Amino acid sequence: MSKSGLWVGTSWKMNKTLAEAMVFADGLAAADDARDQRIQRFVIPPFTAARQVKERLKATSVKVGAQNMHWDDAGAWTGEISPVMLSDCDLDIVELGHSERREHFGETDRTVGLKTAAAVKHGLVPLICIGETLAQREAGEADTVLKRQVEGAFAFLEGAARKAPVLLAYEPVWAIGVNGIPATADYADARHRLIGEVAERALGVKVPVLYGGSVNPQNCEELILQPHIDGLFIGRSAWDVGGYLDILQRVARAI
């Protein structure tokens, strides 16, 4: 099977000092000659390291992002970061709607939609996280939840913005974190097919859908070979640069 146009990256959550982030960036830059053109690599550090990581990786094809942002350009939003600020740091991607932010910080489909529109306005690629909880899955509500989240994410896109690059990351809430149980490849692919169909109906273009949720060296190859999975969004298995490079190599061999 041959696949291309895949996205494989990692978000570090609230981890890594600036020094630790630069060790990762240095290791990734040093391995740039071994990159596979079929795979778009990306890393999403904490805010405190994003600019420096971007600068270190500027000569590579690695895209660098932020883990969140506000929808306003500026204003009385103490503690927030605006899309203007992210653009000023020369970042490429912004992660939006992660389940931890939905659960602990009151993110809603509406706020994710506002942020998506703001990101596109400022030339950032939104990486929108969606996923059902265990209770929703067991109640047979997964597909309904995913459809609502996708449509909410795109609700404020208008005109040309509806054709701008966007990414979706399917991260079932029960599959992420230390105690997460990875979705089976079949289950994940079925959800990806639905998500892709809903997104294409909403925007009129194909939207890449990445899988995230306890991705590791043991399951990355089976996952990436599924027909509707367009990439991998990796957690702790890729927080060490060696682990990230290992998964990249496994994916490249598999496709």
Swiss-Prot record:
The keyword Cytoplasm applies. Its EC number is 5.3.1.33. GO terms for cellular component: cytosol. Pathway: Carbohydrate metabolism; erythritol degradation. InterPro entries: Aldolase_TIM, TIM_sf, Triosephosphate_isomerase, Triosephosphate_isomerase_AS. Keywords: Cytoplasm, Gluconeogenesis, Glycolysis, Isomerase, Pentose shunt. One of its GO terms (biological process) is glycerol catabolic process. It catalyses: L-erythrulose 1-phosphate = D-erythrulose 4-phosphate. It is an enzyme of class 5 (isomerase). Homodimer. Belongs to the triosephosphate isomerase family. NCBIfam families: PRK00042.2-1, tim. This is L-erythrulose-1-phosphate isomerase. It comes from Rhizobium meliloti (strain 1021). The gene is eryH.
